[in-house]
């Protein structure tokens, strides 16, 4: 047995539905830093403990940050809904020694293929936010958001506790903007 704390802790939130597309404001969080004076002693709150936090945010237009695929007749992949993917049979990869090109994989059309990040409807994870109150670095006008936090410590007897995390947001200023162009001689 040993004493001490893990050097890294990771938290990933569930998807957060904002109810409608919004503009994001600041990311606020409360991190407490602790240090244990030594073996068998209770940790105490210490602001100077070498504990860091990196909080990343991503935003999306739909309720899944993943895209699901099944195999086609010619071995390619086609995107399907999560429900269609879950109904498809799992991939059973069979290795054959006697194929035209010296062996390979037999894949059956309709089987589950890859699950990838949905880069069409979801942003990449933002650059890390290291201080509370920073402006959120994720695209606005999105309805869904997800947060992940990494709390790291350089010493075995220090750790951090994330007490709260909140996202400032506001309604969109306009859902759509329409402009008209007319010749100066023919105003409308």
Question: What do the PLM-derived regions correspond to, one by one?
Answer:
Residues 1-188:
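Beta-strand-rich ligand- or partner-binding modules
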């Amino acid at each position: 047995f040993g004493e001490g704390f893990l050097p890294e802790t990771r938290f990933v939130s569930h998807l957060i539905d904002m109810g409608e597309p919004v503009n994001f404001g600041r990311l606020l969080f409360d991190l407490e830093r602790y240090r244990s004076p030594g073996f068998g002693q209770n940790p105490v709150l210490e602001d100077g403990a070498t504990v860091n936090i990196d909080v990343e945010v991503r935003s999306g237009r739909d309720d899944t940050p993943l895209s699901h695929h099944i195999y086609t007749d010619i071995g390619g992949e086609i995107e399907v809904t999560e429900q269609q993917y879950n109904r498809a049979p799992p991939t059973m990869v069979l290795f054959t020694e006697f194929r035209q090109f010296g062996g390979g994989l037999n894949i059956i059309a309709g089987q589950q293929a890859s699950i990838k990040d949905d880069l069409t409807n979801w942003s990449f994870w933002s650059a890390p936010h290291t201080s509370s109150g920073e402006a959120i670095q994720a695209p606005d006008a999105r309805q869904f958001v997800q947060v992940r936090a990494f709390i790291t410590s350089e010493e075995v007897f220090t750790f951090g506790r994330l007490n709260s995390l909140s996202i400032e947001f506001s309604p969109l200023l306009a859902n759509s903007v329409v402009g008209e162009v007319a010749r100066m001689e023919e105003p409308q």
